[in-house]
Amino acid sequence: MTSLYALIRPLLFRLDAERAHDLTAKALRVTSRAPLLPRLIRALYAWEDPLLAVDWSGLHFANPVGVAAGFDKRADLVDGLALLGFGHIEVGTVTPRPQPGNPRPRLFRLPEDTALINRLGFNSPGMVAVARALRARRSRDVIVGVNIGKNRDTPLERAVEDYVATFVALAPIADYVAVNISSPNTPGLRRLHERAALETLLHELTRLNRALPHPRPIALKVSPDETPDQLEAVVRAGCDAGIAAFIATNTTLARDDLHSRLAIETGGLSGRPLTQRARQVIGAIYRLTHGAPPVIGVGGIATAEDAYQHIRAGARLIQIYTGMVYAGPAIARDIKQGLARRLRRDGFTSLEEAVGVMVAA
């Protein structure tokens, strides 16, 4: 049966990609606040199965399917996204001070490749506005992470100050914090992958975290464009600092085998072209860490099979952004149902039993 989104999508795709996103965000906000609608939306989308539950660093996830950072930069869509059945929502990237990001147009669909290119550039309302939005949210049964970054005009040698400021402001009201050093759209940011800079940043954040009354899990979001040696150095630095997870991966600068005329646009590529590379990075990290700390897999997930193969490669949790643009609001439900079928088919009694089996084999 044709879904409602399949009928609406051609209309949305006639709009500029960011304009369509803004309309979607508005619809989510309205839906979450309207009388009776939240109950109806939950009935349609909030399917759960105990087989899919995941525990990580003291947090209990009803299911492994989350929303990747970038979809909700203002932290004002949490209530709406929670209605769609996601197990966690990562808001941001959040910078200390408000900044507009790069000039529009800065978000592009590549339908021939089931992909997006973005050069948003950390457009953010700033940490004060995000803190206000997080305190105002109604949904308390969904895990909320905060992805943090630096302001564009902050010199790289002072980047630690930006991460510290945002961490101090937001960690106490988030369930976990993700450190974004891998966006390709902030000049020089990926230089923080260099071991000395990364060690300084992570050790300062973990020091501050230990001083909190209730320390939060810290995850490190990594680039898909590192060489094997560079990736290993990043993983070693993260492990030495005691981070709680790696998020693999961010968007890529690679442009391999694309068919869309918009492939020439600058920015980070996400979606189907990233699927295999993200899975390779997930597997590489899992081999290095043996799953401790775990991997949160993101990149090119649009179906239950995509999610299952990321999990088999080593991901304990997964995140979606581009897949939702193409598949619509039922994507979390559809992936969860497909995952449960695959886990039972293959004889697993929990999702966590399937994590990394492809690597272990």
UniProtKB/Swiss-Prot annotation:
Keywords: Cell membrane, Flavoprotein, FMN, Membrane, Oxidoreductase, Pyrimidine biosynthesis. Binds 1 FMN per subunit. This is Dihydroorotate dehydrogenase (quinone). It comes from Roseiflexus sp. (strain RS-1). Monomer. Belongs to the dihydroorotate dehydrogenase family. Type 2 subfamily. NCBIfam families: PRK05286.1-2, PRK05286.2-5, pyrD_sub2. It is found in: Cell membrane. CDD domains: DHOD_2_like. The keyword Cell membrane applies. GO terms for molecular function: dihydroorotate dehydrogenase (quinone) activity. The active site is at 183 (nucleophile). Pfam families: DHO_dh. Pathway: Pyrimidine metabolism; UMP biosynthesis via de novo pathway; orotate from (S)-dihydroorotate (quinone route): step 1/1. It is a peripheral membrane protein. FMN binds at residues 69-73, 93, 147, 180, 221, 249, 271, 300, 321-322. It catalyses: (S)-dihydroorotate + a quinone = orotate + a quinol. PANTHER family: DIHYDROOROTATE DEHYDROGENASE (QUINONE), MITOCHONDRIAL, DIHYDROOROTATE DEHYDROGENASE (QUINONE), MITOCHONDRIAL-RELATED. Substrate binds at residues 73, 118-122, 180, 185, 250-251. GO terms for cellular component: cytoplasm; plasma membrane. The lineage of its organism: Bacteria, Bacillati, Chloroflexota, Chloroflexia, Chloroflexales. It is an enzyme of class 1 (oxidoreductase). HAMAP family: DHO_dh_type2. Its cofactor is FMN. Catalyzes the conversion of dihydroorotate to orotate with quinone as electron acceptor. It comes from the Bacteria. The gene is pyrD. Its EC number is 1.3.5.2. One of its GO terms (biological process) is 'de novo' UMP biosynthetic process.
